[in-house]
Amino acid sequence: MAADGKNVLIMAGGTGGHVFPALACAREFQARGYSVHWLGTPRGIENELVPQAGLPLHLIQVTGLRGKGKLSLLKAPFTLVKAVLQARRIVRELKPVCVIGFGGYVTGPGGVAARLCGVPLVIHEQNARAGTANRLLVPLAARVCEAFPGTFEANDKLRTTGNPVRPELFMDAQRAPLAERRARLLVMGGSLGAEPLNKLLPKALSEVPANLRPEVFHQAGKNHAPTTAERYHEAGVEAQVEPFIKDMAHAYGWADMVVCRAGALTVSELAAAGLPSVLVPLPHAIDDHQTHNAQYLAREGAAFLMPQATTGAAQLAERLNEVLMQPEKLNTMAGTARRLAKPAATSTVVDICLEVAHG
């Protein structure tokens, strides 16, 4: 443990969308000489990623309340009080100069514990529509960071920072001019894959004229890659289908255009990489936050927003034809995406934390 005055406590859990931006900030804190500790829950992805990063992980017992039965709701106040007490014990032990929450169930009890212990609290919201925990913590926070403008009502605490993403994504890819080669299309469905996209893309690309049809790299998810590859074969479309993408920076650098969901981190990475996109938001995301994320790029012309419910193979093929026949349109969209990126997001968030810590 670092000497008093050099500990920072990060709260993030559940999904990679919360954890990866927090890890980027953890590395920045460490580069500035701070010891980073992590508050999480036993079931989230943080249990794999945080130890891999060499960071001490402290766990509290808390789960979400949405969609739970009446008995769980009756127990909720007692569960939350217990979680706050667990978090308070950890905060008292670590004596951090600052606590920053990136979302997930852990953030609520942890944020309350920080306030009870008199430790400055900063929250960071990755999505264009704020999560429940972050909305509730706004009154307790010393600073509120939003990735996308307009997520929170304007106030003196608010800072628009962007999402911390990997710095290698901001490097300019050296691609040959489109006039000299076929366009390259990257399809992503997240680590588990997106089966609606796995079904839609082979059909849509079969309707794109062969002379315009792009090279395709399709990340289909662990359980869906063989079936997706067979769909492409049956559609007469050549495609490289893989369950995972191990090197995202390389994949983004290879692509000219992306078809994917609209998670907050994905949207921020597309901007960082300067990539045009077709965004098909997850229709059942909480508070429809993926649609709001997608609008950040779509409003400015860096992406096409195509709702899953109204997007069939013909509609997607028409959109792909539109841009594949106009390489200059792809270039314009790419420039717009890059203009919307926030390359200083990580350092800005850390600056804000240390500002409130040492004030």
UniProtKB/Swiss-Prot annotation:
Signal peptide: none
UniProt keyword Glycosyltransferase, yes or no: yes
Catalytic activity, reaction form: di-trans,octa-cis-undecaprenyl diphospho-N-acetyl-alpha-D-muramoyl-L-alanyl-D-glutamyl-meso-2,6-diaminopimeloyl-D-alanyl-D-alanine + UDP-N-acetyl-alpha-D-glucosamine = di-trans,octa-cis-undecaprenyl diphospho-[N-acetyl-alpha-D-glucosaminyl-(1->4)]-N-acetyl-alpha-D-muramoyl-L-alanyl-D-glutamyl-meso-2,6-diaminopimeloyl-D-alanyl-D-alanine + UDP + H(+)
GO terms of molecular function: UDP-N-acetyl-D-glucosamine:N-acetylmuramoyl-L-alanyl-D-glutamyl-meso-2,6-diaminopimelyl-D-alanyl-D-alanine-diphosphoundecaprenol 4-beta-N-acetylglucosaminlytransferase activity; undecaprenyldiphospho-muramoylpentapeptide beta-N-acetylglucosaminyltransferase activity
Stretches of the chain forming a coiled coil according to its record: none
Domain of life assignment: Bacteria
GO cellular component: plasma membrane
Stated role: Cell wall formation. Catalyzes the transfer of a GlcNAc subunit on undecaprenyl-pyrophosphoryl-MurNAc-pentapeptide (lipid intermediate I) to form undecaprenyl-pyrophosphoryl-MurNAc-(pentapeptide)GlcNAc (lipid intermediate II).
Protein name stated in the entry: UDP-N-acetylglucosamine--N-acetylmuramyl-(pentapeptide) pyrophosphoryl-undecaprenol N-acetylglucosamine transferase
Gene symbol of the encoding locus: murG
